[in-house]
């Protein structure tokens, strides 16, 4: 799975072949087919693993004693995930295959609705737009070529500062 994730991050889903995945893990293409019948199954498995990471952050946030603490935990976790997954962020946010998958994947849509509700305190078209803008800004920043030399700690501090300002949160 990690080989496919890395290749998707580097080449996009469309630019990654099953042969490339097989070569990366040192097996035959037939061995990959034995585990996953189609490339779509690999895409789904990678996407579900990424969604599980987001869900874990959201669950930690929901466990907080008050909405402000939940927002802070969620925002920090989102930024940390984006920074840790910089290599994959481009595929997650701009790959047409993944975008189509996520747009039709009910668990993703439900997860994002929950995330935006915790982060913004409401479920409305405006909240969805604000949430989408914020997540796109975070994702875009971590993969932006002008910021590749910025160390993770500095990037994290700046992203949190700007995201808090966007959300009207203290700090």
Located regions from the model:
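Short, flexible helix-adjacent loops and helix caps
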Residues: 13, 59, 63-66, 146-147, ...
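Hydrophobic alpha-helical connector segments
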Residues: 41, 45, 56-87
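Helix-turn-helix
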Residues: 3, 7-41, 45
């Amino acid at each position: 799975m990690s080989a496919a994730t890395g290749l998707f991050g580097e080449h996009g889903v469309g630019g990654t072949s099953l042969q490339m995945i097989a070569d990366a893990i040192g097996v035959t293409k037939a061995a990959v087919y034995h585990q996953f019948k189609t490339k779509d199954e690999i895409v789904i498995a990678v996407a579900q693993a990424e969604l599980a990471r987001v869900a874990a952050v959201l669950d930690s946030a929901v466990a907080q004693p008050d909405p402000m603490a939940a927002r802070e935990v969620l925002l920090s976790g989102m930024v940390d995930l984006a920074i840790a997954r910089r290599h994959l962020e481009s595929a997650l946010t701009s790959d047409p295959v993944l975008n189509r998958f996520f747009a039709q994947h009910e668990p993703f849509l439900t997860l994002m609705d929950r995330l935006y509700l915790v982060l913004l305190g409401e479920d409305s078209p405006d909240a969805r737009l604000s949430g989408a803008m914020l997540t796109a800004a975070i994702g875009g920043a971590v993969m932006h070529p002008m910021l590749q030399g910025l160390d993770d700690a500095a990037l994290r501090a700046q992203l949190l500062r700007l995201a808090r300002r966007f959300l009207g949160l203290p700090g």
